[in-house]
Swiss-Prot record:
Gene this chain is encoded by: Nps
Name of the protein in its database record: Neuropeptide S
Keyword Lyase applies: no
GO annotation, cellular component aspect: extracellular region; synapse
Stored InterPro entries: Neuropeptide_S
Keywords of this entry: Cleavage on pair of basic residues, Neuropeptide, Secreted, Signal
Localisation: Secreted
């Protein structure tokens, strides 16, 4: 059980690190005259898209979470109006 949790954690961590490193160039070699074969091309990186295209897939999710429900008399707004009055007495 714990072994499978460790394996899934390592897999998820490695996938997230690979995604981050996929969009950034690898450090170039410091040997002069030697070509750098390990430079990752950034033209295929999704993070280089324009701002409107980059977050287009998140737009429906953000719209749902930012939608606020209105209730009458402040019920459900998160503010407990009577608890402060009780504590004051």
């Amino acid at each position: 059980m714990i072994g499978s949790l460790k394996l899934s954690f390592v897999l998820a961590l490695s996938l997230s690190v690979m995604h981050v490193l996929w969009c950034y160039p690898v450090l170039s070699s410091k040997v002069p005259g030697k070509p750098d074969y390990f430079l990752i091309l950034l033209s295929s990186c999704p993070a280089r898209l324009e701002g409107s295209d980059r977050l287009a897939f998140l737009k429906p999710i953000l719209e749902k979470t930012s939608m606020k429900r209105s209730f009458r008399n402040g019920v459900g707004s998160g503010a407990k109006k009577t608890s402060f009055r009780r504590a004051k007495q």
